[in-house]
């Protein structure tokens, strides 16, 4: 498997629960390195741009409203098979369907307030990383 980078966002619900460190521990325990990170409070424009792929979906407005409801923690994870590994750590989008021990099963409340976002493919990972960390804000470790 190749070394990959993927974007991860700890969403407002998980930030409010003060579980950033617990989630970071899961990334690192799984062999993922955090090569860039920042806390931000997304503007409506940023959230709309980032989730633009969903703009025609019925949940788009609620998603944007949720993502701007409080600060988020944004990080780039790097490691062998980082995209799939992060998605396994996150668990199913709906925490009720997520396997026990996954981030969403342990820290999410609903399909809307589901604790984390993770890139789903190498192409989207590259776009998402560049969206939040343009240029030289990501470092090899």
Swiss-Prot record:
It comes from the Bacteria. GO terms for cellular component: cytoplasm. SMART domains: NDK. Its cofactor is Mg(2+). Keywords: ATP-binding, Cytoplasm, Kinase, Magnesium, Metal-binding, Nucleotide metabolism, Nucleotide-binding, Phosphoprotein, Transferase. ATP binds at residues 11, 59, 87, 93, 104, 114. Its EC number is 2.7.4.6. Its main location: cytoplasm. Gene3D superfamilies: Nucleoside diphosphate kinase-like domain. GO terms for molecular function: ATP binding; metal ion binding; nucleoside diphosphate kinase activity. The active site is at 117 (pros-phosphohistidine intermediate). Belongs to the NDK family. Major role in the synthesis of nucleoside triphosphates other than ATP. The ATP gamma phosphate is transferred to the NDP beta phosphate via a ping-pong mechanism, using a phosphorylated active-site intermediate. HAMAP family: NDP_kinase. Homotetramer. This is Nucleoside diphosphate kinase. It comes from Polynucleobacter necessarius subsp. necessarius (strain STIR1).
